[in-house]
Amino acid sequence: MEESASVDSVESLCSSTTTRSDRSSGPKVSDTELRSKGRPIEKMYKDPSKGELPLLPVELVQESAKDVTYICPFIGPIRGSLTVTNYRLFFRCTDREPVFGLDLPLGVLSRVEKIGAATGRGDVSYGLACKDMRNLRFVHKEPDDSLKKSVFEVLMKFAFPVSNNMSLFAFEYKQVFPENGWKVYDPLAECKRQGLPNESWRISKLNDHYELCDSYPATLVVPVTITDDELRRVSSFRAKGRIPVLSWIHPESQAAVVRSSQPMVGQNGRRCKEDEKLLQAIMDANAQSHKLFIFDARPSVNAAANKMKGGGFESEDAYQNAELVFLDIHNIHVMRESLRKLKEVVYPNIEESHWLSNLESTHWLEHIKLILAGALRIADKVESGKTSVVVHCSDGWDRTAQLTSLALIMLDSHYRTIRGFQILVEKEWLSFGHRFQQRVGHGDKNHTDVDRSPIFLQFIDCVWQMTRQFPAAFEFNEYFLITILDHLYSCLFGTFLCNSEQQRLKEEIPKRTVSLWSFVNSQLEEFVNPLYVHYSSHVLFPTVGIRHLQLWVSYYIRWNPRMRPQEPVHQRYKELLAKRAELQKRVEELQREVSSRTASSSSERAGSPTRSITPVQTFV
């Protein structure tokens, strides 16, 4: 799809800048830091061209087979050798020039199954369905030794360790990096950055042991006028005990972004005076507005249907001065089906003659548009309307996380830096209980599980859409986003394991596994956007009309060699960064030279009339 030439749209708001204090905790990544940053003690991957398999520490070969045929959908059958370790699958064909290879973390696999009848007697053919938009197929002979396990059995065992009562590879991987990524996010430090606590908001310890809500973080920010006893009663009224708590506060207007789950009003319109008091306190904490907007992510029909199950939505009669808005974002099942259709359209081959109609039939970009449009409405109410908002869906851990995190990226430039984005993911997704284990299915062979859904993928896709519209507003590049998605599935790091903060602490994830951010922060130069310009007060209002959105080809169609750029984009980024550093150094040298000459000239002309010199500003 081609990018539309038009920039503005009646459906959306244009980008704007507001005068605002800088909350960024720490400077952006400097060129000096990039040059001096320490690298990992051991590289993650060695050079595979020397014949040896590039194994990680504690990665062990479990099975290998020669004379295996990979049925490549792009260039036809390729014969080579296949090796399965406790972490990944290698396929190598050394008869081709250049050497052909596949390197697939087993965590990426969603399904492994024997398929059809192979071409020859004694042959076995099996297909691998992947979570990263690929499907792979291999054919090889069964082992002669009946006691020897087949590659298929080994794959089933190590691709789905949870189903086989085994540990994920992340618990074995012990690579040491210069920085501990588990310390990236400190909730109290993030509160302090936002100016919390203050006269209107307090930090509650009520959930320190996860007794109030086991899917919420230990640190909660709530209005000062609400007691802990009242919070307990609110907890019994909100689905899964997920009470309204602060996500972000505007540094000037004090307008707040608050998240929760649906109220359990049921068919009889049950009310909770403590819940009503809490939402009134949220409104009162913002002196600039006497109104509160409640954004329900669901279609109104779905929200009404939830009343049959005891759920529902806030009545405007019960919540004075509150306005309810439905954002029409569909549930996890609709999103899962949409991604399935998208995979059929983009892999392995694209039907050129029906590309646009086929893409439209998946409704993928329509869903992306609705998520972005919802986040934009939230950001606009907070920034332009100076009004506090409450955001929820049903349980408050899927669509709610998408909306709050995207709105925060639009509102706060700190979250558009590399480290700020890491904090955002840790805060809005991990600490607030997005169910990564259920939605991704780490190590679980039950590929038909109805709890699986690409919720986090959609969020990253929305971020990518914004980086296209505001190429200088984000410190990170596209490769950063793709790396996060690759390791969402890889099970190499512990970052995306489990369903909640409580579960991760119970499983001792920070002690027993390595954080993805340890790896990322050890090689920041790989992920820096050379076009980035730091403006602390810049608020982003992206254009969300469907004609301004694009399919993320570099992610969804990256396995098709016809769609692959001749040179990796992130390699060009690195070259641009090096050139920028070189030019910046030259500018500094010239400025020192000009200053030296000016000082020398001034001393020579002491006592004589002086000329005013207009300084020349240079931008690199």
UniProtKB/Swiss-Prot annotation:
The keyword Cytoplasm applies. Residues 569-601 form a coiled coil. Its EC number is 3.1.3.95. GO terms for molecular function: phosphatidylinositol-3,5-bisphosphate 3-phosphatase activity; phosphatidylinositol-3-phosphate phosphatase activity; protein tyrosine phosphatase activity. The keyword NADP does not apply. Its main location: cytoplasm. Residues 181-556 form the Myotubularin phosphatase domain. GO terms for biological process: phosphatidylinositol dephosphorylation. SUPFAM superfamilies: (Phosphotyrosine protein) phosphatases II (SSF52799), PH domain-like (SSF50729). Keywords: Coiled coil, Cytoplasm, Endosome, Hydrolase, Lipid metabolism, Membrane. Residues 596-612 have a biased composition (Low complexity). InterPro entries: GRAM, Myotubularin, Myotubularin-like_Pase_dom, PH-like_dom_sf, Prot-tyrosine_phosphatase-like, Tyr_Pase_AS, Tyr_Pase_cat, Tyr_Pase_dom. Residues 20-48 have a biased composition (Basic and acidic residues). Residues 1-14 have a biased composition (Polar residues). Residues 39-116 form the GRAM domain. It catalyses: a 1,2-diacyl-sn-glycero-3-phospho-(1D-myo-inositol-3,5-bisphosphate) + H2O = a 1,2-diacyl-sn-glycero-3-phospho-(1D-myo-inositol-5-phosphate) + phosphate; a 1,2-diacyl-sn-glycero-3-phospho-(1D-myo-inositol-3-phosphate) + H2O = a 1,2-diacyl-sn-glycero-3-phospho-(1D-myo-inositol) + phosphate; 1,2-dioctanoyl-sn-glycero-3-phospho-(1-D-myo-inositol-3-phosphate) + H2O = 1,2-dioctanoyl-sn-glycero-3-phospho-(1D-myo-inositol) + phosphate; 1,2-dioctanoyl-sn-glycero-3-phospho-(1D-myo-inositol-3,5-bisphosphate) + H2O = 1,2-dioctanoyl-sn-glycero-3-phospho-(1D-myo-inositol-5-phosphate) + phosphate. It is found in: Cytoplasm; Early endosome membrane. SMART domains: GRAM (SM00568), PTPc_motif (SM00404). The active site is at 393 (phosphocysteine intermediate). GO terms for cellular component: cytoplasm; cytosol; early endosome membrane; membrane. Residues 1-48, 590-620 are annotated as: Disordered. It is a peripheral membrane protein. Belongs to the protein-tyrosine phosphatase family. Non-receptor class myotubularin subfamily. This is Phosphatidylinositol-3,5-bisphosphate 3-phosphatase MTMR2.
